[in-house]
């Protein structure tokens, strides 16, 4: 019989019979050389055959196995319920598959994945049990080791205070930890990476960004760091190609407290710089006032010398005049410079943000500060800290005067616009102008600039070649306008 005839009569029994006729020992040879452990028992479950793979697996020779019950291999590690389920299935003449912990001849235990099939004769009577089993101890050990590693890794990741997330090449989340899930829940169930508007593809390996995000109505600052992870394909079609698009590990840490501490430190340093600027301006203003007061008698002495003649020999008059001139020169040398920093161009929005941060705690339900700009792209020019000190002096003055009018809630409006090369700052409030001009502060001698805010503002504005205008508002209150030249105005358009 040819193979074509066998295929034409595609019946398993016919094919098996034909192969047996052509190759009488084929099936026996196949079973003998099979790498799978195969055993055959009679209907009473006594072993009547075992192939070499079975003997190698169990440690018993074929002679030792013949006429023995397979319970010879059983161990107490397999639960009794497993055997009961197995025999219940086999007695119903159904095949059974499961896992058993068997014992070798040397006492060693091993785990097998076993298939037992009842073999029936043509009359449907049970004649044999065919068992094929594979030792899966090594694969099970590796599987459990991997599971333990995954459990350990998940436990470690979930106990890390930072959020950890792995994304694929399309920025889809592949794995995340409990902290990341908590962040997403706090964001109203939205994906945290989407809220941060961050893409690892746009960040280089090891790159770090500090980004703000609104969590439960409050702004929090998160540090985002990325690392590339080598990928291994999970698709069966890429079994022989051990490569896959790289994934990205992202660690997201809450640095809000550190950010707040840094910001508070920066504001404290800014306060110190502003206080130093106010103090220098107060000293300069006081010395200028002293120079003006001293200049009058010195001019009178100079006039007297001219009337008497410079060579008249009036020693006392000449000595008084020289002492006065030297005193004037000493005072001039003592006048501090107001140049605490170099002139520069800076954006106005962060400037106003700093002003609001400095005075946020001083405004409550009875005091309101509103800041507006004609354009979000406005810039200022000059010494940023000194111009900030100008606004600070005015706010200090206004808040102090408003405290004397407890029945009137304070409202301050700050508006900025650019007007033909000048930056104009409009400060409007509801404090009467007369009180602003003539109010006296009892703390003028105890605090730098206290009680002389308007004069100090004039000094700082004049130093920046600016202009100041103080007027009463038609609807009541005071309007202070500060005008500062922009860079183009001072340089004739050259930058």
Swiss-Prot record:
The keyword Transcription regulation applies. It comes from the Bacteria. The keyword Signal does not apply. Pfam families: PAS (PF00989). InterPro entries: DGC-Regulatory_Protein, HATPase_C_sf, N_fixation_neg-reg_NifL, PAC, PAS, PAS-assoc_C, PAS-like_dom_sf, PAS_fold. Changing residue 465 to S: In strain: NG13. GO terms for biological process: nitrogen fixation; phosphorelay signal transduction system; regulation of DNA-templated transcription. Coiled coil: none annotated. Residues 23-93, 151-174 form the PAS domain. Keywords: Nitrogen fixation, Repeat, Transcription, Transcription regulation, Two-component regulatory system. Changing residue 250 to V: In strain: NG13. Gene3D superfamilies: PAS domain. Residues 94-148 form the PAC domain. SUPFAM superfamilies: ATPase domain of HSP90 chaperone/DNA topoisomerase II/histidine kinase, PYP-like sensor domain (PAS domain). NCBIfam families: nifL_nitrog (TIGR02938), sensory_box (TIGR00229). Required for the inhibition of NifA activity in response to oxygen and low level of fixed nitrogen. This is Nitrogen fixation regulatory protein.
